[in-house]
Amino acid sequence: MDKLFLFDAYALIYRSYYAFIKNPRINSKGLNTSAVMGFCNTLHEVLTKEKPTYLGVAFDPHGPTFRTEAYAEYKAQREETPEDIRRAVPIIKSLLKAMRIPVLEADGYEADDVIGTLALKAGAEGVMTYMLTPDKDYGQLVRENVMMYRPRHGGGYETLDAEKVCAKYGIANTSQVIDLLGLMGDSADNIPGCPGVGEKTAVKLINEFGSVEQLLEQTDKLKGALKKKVEENAEQIKFSKFLATIKTDVPVELNLDELKVSEPDADELRKIFTELEFKTLADKFLNKAENNKKSVQIQLDLFAENPTDGQVFSKNASLRALNELPHTYKLIDNEEEMKKICDFFMTKKILSLDTETTSTSAIDAELVGLSFSVKEFEAFYVPVPTNREEAQKIVNIFKPLYENPEIVKVGQNIKYDMEVLASYGVCVAGQLFDTMIAHYLIQPELRHNMDYMAETCLGYQTIHIEELIGPKGKKQKSMRDLPPEQIVDYAAEDADVTLQLKNYLEPKLEEVGVTQLFYEIEMPLVRVLAEMELNGVRIDTAALAETSEILTKRLSDIEKRIYELAGEEFNIASPKQVGEILFGKLKIVEKPKKTKTGQYVTSEEVLQQLSGKHEIVGKILEHRGLKKLLGTYVDALPKLINPRTGHIHTSFNQTATATGRLSSSDPNLQNIPVRGEDGKEIRKAFIPEEGCLFFSADYSQIELRVMAHLSGDENMIEAFRSGHDIHAATAAKIYKEDIADVTRDQRTKAKRANFGIIYGITVFGLAERLDISRQEASQLIDGYFITFPKVHEYMEKAKQTAREQGYVETFFRRRRYLPDINSHNGTVRGFAERNAINAPIQGSAADIIKVAMVRIYKRFKDENLRSKMILQVHDELNFSVVPEEKETVERIVLEEMQGAYKLNVPLVADCGWGANWLEAH
């Protein structure tokens, strides 16, 4: 049977845009591509999974519709369309044109009406029709051959036929959806309905009377307040039904030939995807062979009506490839030539280097080849044999070059190359220049991989590794499987392009004002992190095994208790089944929250609020916590121990966060739980080297101290300088108590206010977090700003600075760009404003600990200490310490942490010693 898909464009565009609201997709020209990307992903998913015969996309028209003419308040409550969505719409229409997919519009009618009319016509002709939309009002159109295709919360789609729509809303037939909406209204469209009548009552009334009209004719059968509400609002109910009714007689023709899915205009589609920097989507939509054509003209003025301020990078007019450019790449495969080029490189001041290896994990990688470049478009590739002894001989030829401190070493993610070379006895020396980190400091929100940077900075399309070893998967080859002749262009290009990127990015660092941050903090930190990753950290597997046994037994006991309380067994890991037990069977609350698809919400946040309602809620939360602890850490960590070293080797990432904080992966040690007895057991398993001590030092309330410095608030500065507990001091001032009389509850509230306000917490957010009324939360925030007036001034000034220049900065001039700071949409603007307040605080704190790490590392080297820095977790540094160096290490660490930056308040670090991380922390 033929299939027709009709897309509700704006509903999907809005959904896509807000899905990325916390982490918007911004390309190198500053264009927010979230809405376009999300829409394209949906389109591709439908085309590949559902393989429709016909497809059309309906848009709301410009100007009024019959509903707004009849009711000026229709949708009037909605905030102004975000600028980024307005910019996205013409781009999406251009994409659809290139895809040869019709855009469906009718003056005076909404997309709903156009879809409704075409869906019914197509269904009547025997075409199975799917209306792709998240909007519930489409349920009224569902009938034979006409179904809803609705995005699920969290991914995927659900198909709703007439039976499912009726079951969902508890009605007899789908036409009654409009009767429900007429009674209960629809806040999304500002349809008023009948005041005081919710979904439950509306369903009951429609099941009893059949329709709004029948109900209004028989109001004498109603009683009390409900009778009065319905009679007093009869006209409003009828009018609400009119507004909710989707028109099915719009003057549009069903032309299946025009709607037939066909091959796209590949050249035009490629132009648009290239301009958007959608490489993955281009690969998805276009034939791979076509997509790899090496000359792609970019229509630079495609989006010229929306220029972006503060643009750092511009795109060249075409993407060039290696075979179009004069270049000299040489394969060096004999010892005599190797020595000659090494001597040649030793006369240069700058060397771009790269390694080809067998693994993306540096600790396990073996060398396949070495690449070098000292001049743009010239590069050399040296293959390295499999035999370790032979490989070492070749590395030794270049060892003096790598270890020459007078030569600047340039690399893309150079930390990886340094670690690989370290396993061959090479200690890379000299000033470093990492192109990935340089690009990150200039535009932190963008991608920083070489392929992307080559395209956006150099207008150059690199050879992709998949062209050599195939796509990811079981059949992907290793670089070791290829002869050197096949690798040379790819490997030499890496070193060459890295050098070109260095020459392009270096002046940009100066333009943005981050040269000092780059050379004095981020580049020295590369060495620190490389050594920490190579050192790794020891894990007490016996302790973890014991913890696993204890927690698994507890988990089993909790499960039994949950089943007892529920009166039946069910899948505790299933949110759906948990919701049905808590709210369907036990009815622990009268009006539980539901998702748009009608499923009960059982998130941790919701269950925390309900934990006092029934014992089962606390048990489910406890079960979830233990399950996560076991799966993520207790049972997982032993499997991550490297069998050769006996250590866990995490990767520290310098370019993963917008704020400048370090993150870690494989495994993520930043999220190891701190609170709770069970979480502490994890830290207990982290131990120092054999015969060593574990030393931990962490900053005390560094973000609040940074806030005190930035705001210059005298009261906050005085509280820190006097050495008081800052939260007790805050509570004393807010509640006008002597600090000795502050209660634990008052201190807790002040602590939440202290940290919450840094993150731009609202009255509603603080009320929820503290489980207090909004009035009390409002009084607490007001009291806070009366106590610390300059904190409020700082917050307002930070937002104003961001509005004027488009970004905010840390102490060290690290920038956070905020393209949405002047948005007319309150939700979007609110995110940007909170980031304007928080980014300088969190970013400065991140920079301070980086400074401390660099200085501590240098002091350890200068004093020839054998003790090692092994972990960094947010504001905390951890060390494996040789016992006789104990006093020296503590002195150095505290001196450098507390002296990393001169604040108006003391920078304090607390420290501790032990046999493991828990004891030391």
What residues fall within each predicted segment?
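Active-site palm subdomain of RNA-directed nucleic acid polymerases
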Residues: 509-521, 525, 848, 852-873, ...
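Helix-hairpin-helix
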Residues: 185-208, 273-277, 540
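Conserved "right-hand" nucleotidyltransferase catalytic core of DNA-directed polymerases
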Residues: 233-386, 412, 445, 453, ...
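Conserved catalytic core of nucleic-acid polymerases
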Residues: 477-480, 534, 642-645, 649-650, ...
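Conserved RNase H-like, two-metal-ion catalytic cores of nucleic-acid enzymes
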Residues: 3-5, 15-54, 72-73, 77-84, ...
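C-terminal polymerase-core module
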Residues: 553, 557-560, 564-618, 786-838, ...
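Short alpha-helix plus adjacent loop in nuclease-associated cores
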Residues: 73-87, 143-172, 227-229, 380-400, ...
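Noncatalytic, basic helical substrate-engagement surface that gates or grips nucleic-acid strands
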Residues: 2-132, 136-163, 236-239, 245-253, ...
